[in-house]
């Protein structure tokens, strides 16, 4: 950049201010040790800065909340809103598709307690008009029954009626409050049939009595659900055309957005975002359950997940799969483990220099891993293998204790009851893992034998052959050895 070229300096300041907005700062500040020349001061003052050696500019935010489609996953979005509200982060614009349209209306209304209670109690029959069936305690049996009922009803009636959802919307939304909210604009997305054309609706500009229609149109996942008729036109789920409506927020003047993706079906719309548009993605690595079957227990888990993921995004907590107050102790344990491998067992760790090792670890961890974060990655992967749920804030020591006390040979009896209803994909993975349990038992016994017999050569072979899997087993062994109760046990392994 050349001094005096206004356009270049304007862009420079825009990018610097975008960086400050990314960290949600109130001001953008330049601090100089010595007074600036008149020419330099002119450049700063021309671009809105005040002062002489400390030049400040108050940042202006036009923040949007973008709520993607995702059906029964929607509780996650309310959890995100809880965290944002705690930090007094407000929005000028909300854009929502499908369940995002419904949640957008609840958020626009501003009644957190009502939104949370609604999702905590929500079941499939409060959304879809399915035939009554006898109460079933077994989650898997209930899943198959509800899915069969939904498929049969959709085929016979051309889509399951959403009359219960319509009643719930009308009972829980104050239409006058939505219509006359002076601070926040709500835009919903639906798909016009049969053209499959994207329709964006400014909720405050539509007729009051039509507000429920446009919210329901956005969430009508045709043909599984019946389409919505407004006037002479038919409308279906907005996710068919624009699953995550970031572009609408940009077009309506947003300069930054919190984007909440709840794993709705189908690809997201491809858009080109302005260089200085800031967006914070809030999505989870965990699956969120069935897309069309609503379950109160799963909703509560997803509420907690959304809250914790957003708190991590805001820098309050740490972790990738799980949430921690601090991750520093994980590094301490990992350094001790590496020392144990090299000094006590006398293993050689050349695989750490292999690109393939880091690629596999990153693929498993679903995030970047470097030597400094390897200990945390391994700890979280162990927690997953031992069925620890991600809906609480952990201390590293507490997590290690829970891992060491949990038997990997079997799933906890109450695990499904704590999670709630699973999706088809999750049920398949659950069944597959049950079949793998015997293999896990065999591995554990085998490595216990190698460690007890100090079979260094065989351990080295396994470590070079399958470094990630072997490290996880050895790390668990080491963590157990480090537990106070284990050190004091007279028959410790």
What are these model-derived regions, one by one?
Residues 6, 18-20, 52-53:
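Ala/Thr-enriched low-complexity intrinsically disordered regions
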Residues 48-97, 105-493:
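Patatin-like phospholipase
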Residues 19, 28-29:
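Cysteine-centered motifs
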């Amino acid at each position: 950049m050349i001094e005096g070229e206004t356009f270049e300096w304007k862009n420079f300041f825009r990018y610097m201010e975008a960086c400050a907005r990314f960290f949600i700062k109130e001001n953008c500040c330049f601090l100089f040790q010595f007074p600036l020349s008149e020419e330099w001061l002119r450049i700063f003052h021309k671009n809105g800065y005040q002062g002489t050696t400390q030049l400040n500019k108050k940042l202006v935010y036009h923040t949007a909340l973008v709520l993607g489609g995702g059906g029964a996953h929607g509780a996650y979005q309310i959890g995100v809103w809880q965290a944002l509200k705690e930090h007094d982060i407000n929005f000028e614009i909300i854009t929502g598709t499908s369940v995002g349209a419904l949640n957008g209306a609840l958020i626009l209304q501003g009644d957190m307690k009502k939104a949370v209670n609604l999702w905590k109690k929500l079941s499939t029959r409060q959304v879809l008009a399915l035939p009554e069936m006898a109460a079933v305690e077994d989650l898997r049996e209930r899943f198959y029954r509800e899915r069969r009922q939904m498929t049969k009803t959709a085929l016979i009636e051309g889509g399951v009626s959403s009359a219960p959802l319509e009643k719930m919307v009308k009972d829980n939304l104050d239409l006058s409050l939505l219509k006359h909210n002076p601070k926040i604009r709500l835009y919903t997305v639906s798909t016009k049939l049969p053209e499959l054309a994207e329709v964006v609706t400014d909720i405050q500009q539509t007729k009051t009595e039509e507000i429920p229609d446009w919210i329901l149109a956005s969430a009508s996942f045709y043909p599984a659900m019946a389409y919505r008729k407004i006037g002479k036109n038919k409308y279906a789920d907005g996710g068919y055309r624009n699953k995550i409506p970031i572009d609408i927020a940009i077009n309506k003047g947003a300069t930054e957005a919190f984007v909440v993706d709840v794993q709705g079906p189908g690809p997201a719309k491809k858009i080109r975002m302005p260089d200085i548009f800031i967006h914070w993605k809030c999505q989870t690595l965990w699956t969120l359950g069935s897309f069309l079957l609503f379950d109160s227990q799963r909703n509560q888990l997803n509420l907690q997940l959304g809250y914790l993921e957003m708190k991590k995004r805001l820098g309050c907590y740490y972790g990738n799969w799980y949430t921690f107050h601090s991750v520093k102790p994980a590094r301490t344990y990992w350094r001790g483990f590496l020392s144990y491998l090299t000094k006590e067992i006398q293993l050689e760790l050349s695989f750490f220099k292999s690109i393939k090792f880091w690629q596999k670890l990153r693929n498993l961890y679903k995030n970047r891993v470097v030597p400094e974060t390897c200990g945390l990655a391994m700890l979280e992967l162990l927690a997953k293998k031992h069925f620890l749920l991600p809906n609480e804030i952990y201390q590293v020591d507490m997590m290690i204790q829970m891992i060491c006390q949990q038997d990997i040979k079997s799933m906890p009896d109450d695990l499904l009851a704590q999670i709630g209803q699973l999706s088809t994909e999750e049920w398949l993975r659950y069944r597959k893992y049950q079949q793998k349990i015997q293999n896990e038992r065999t591995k554990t016994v085998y490595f216990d034998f190698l460690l007890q017999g100090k079979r260094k050569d065989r351990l080295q072979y396994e470590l070079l052959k399958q470094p990630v899997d072997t490290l996880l087993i050895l790390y668990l062994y080491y963590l157990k050895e480090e537990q106070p109760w284990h050190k004091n046990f007279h028959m410790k392994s």
